[in-house]
């Protein structure tokens, strides 16, 4: 028996440096984000939006584009000025070790490409990141939607996002009072609600800017090309709660998706009138004491909406954090095996992102493009998906 134990200990000791070495190699490996599944090429631009009330947002816009020559380089995942700040924020060597070298991530977006002329105008989707994330951290979802004929707009708000780097070189990090990890209980929930309300107002401001861009874009790119009568909103985590809040607040929203976000505030009692979908991770992997209240709030919203305008989907084995590009970048089978052993995930990260992109684009196709509702109930090829109601 002692001999067996010694052998197991020796194998463990030998496995550690191998695991560390493979993880370090994975950090530097070039990673191409999942290829968009739609027929359009994808373009990307940024806008610095301001108004007299001192609201300022750094917006990223992905859109259906005219295809360019295959040899043309795609946009950086993050511009160099952003990358240096994000790398600095990561801080410790361990954090660098466990995360991706962003300079090695390849997108499918062409910088400043001409918007596609296949349609006279395109519906608009506003995308809101989670609490600590940058909107570019959801590039896989944005590119896929753009490839299906949507103009996708995401923004990073100064003081309420981990960091914003403006074109003039200003770097604005999140204000200490917006760090929810430093709070707990009722104080944390109240501050989260305040952030949701502020972000909802930001979405309204972003749509105001898009209306101006549609009427008088100096570059001519988006002039008359934005169909602002067909606006959808989705977000992840606290951004998902924001998507529902904005649809509650503003009739310009025609459909919303909450991706694994806990609803907050008055929408729990009042719900929303627009079609909505909850796209959820596998909460069976979490304690019922934590998920019970969230499920009750989702049920409250769900029960107040007609049956043909609501949907709740769970991706079995999905992890909360892998709806972002964190899932899309996780290609190492070894690291996935470790996450499964730790109980942090049961399905491949890229698989989770693929399922999410399918259901997000299909939902908006149904409610913004009048695709058949039966498309949302087509489970072919997605055995991990469970329709809750």
Q: Residue locations for each model-derived region?
A:
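N-terminal Sec-pathway targeting helices
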Residues: 1-16
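Domain-level recognition of soluble alpha/beta enzyme cores
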Residues: 22-125, 345-349
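The feature captures the conserved acid-bearing segment of alpha/beta-hydrolase catalytic domains
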Residues: 117, 254-320
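Active-site machinery of serine-nucleophile hydrolases
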Residues: 65-66, 76-97, 136-183, 312, ...
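Alpha/beta-hydrolase active-site loop
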Residues: 165-225
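Short substrate-entry loop that stabilizes the transition state in hydrolases
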Residues: 104-165, 285-288
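Primarily recognizes the serine-hydrolase "nucleophile elbow" in alpha/beta-hydrolase
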Residues: 206-271
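Alpha/beta-hydrolase-fold serine-hydrolase catalytic core, especially in secreted/extracellular enzymes
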Residues: 2, 6, 27-36, 50-52, ...
